[in-house]
Amino acid sequence: TELVGLSVDSLYSHIAWLRKIQELSWKGMENVEVKFPLIEDIRMEVANKYGMIQPGQSNTQAVRAVFVIDPEAKIRLILYYPLSTGRNFDEIKRVIQALQKADAENVATPADWRPGDDVIVPTAGSCGTAKERMENSSEDQYCLDWFMCFKREKK
């Protein structure tokens, strides 16, 4: 997993920002070092291609956007935040973990899923499989209904 920052600010603004956040102390964080690349997009070419310049918001500022792009260059998640609202990094991390879990195990994650929680197995492909799942719950798997079966996570 790699992280890349994109800003419509200049390279010099990036340098000044990186230096300043190392000097500041906020919410117990200090000497913060950004360990991912920041891309200068002063012409807003990338920001425009990804829809980060929102009508009615600003013609010179990009909205706060998060894109999760998988190794095959497929966009898996897009989150847009208004210019006035900061990102929720805990949620971004949770979504990335959920995508990685789903890809690795062919499962889905339910609402409010956290690592270690039970996951949803794919819906049965036939009536016979659905009936078998409903009748044969196990330590590893259980169903709430024919279409909603879970895999227990080992704790």
Residue ranges and their predicted role:
Residues 1-155:
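Chalcogenol-based redox active-site neighborhoods
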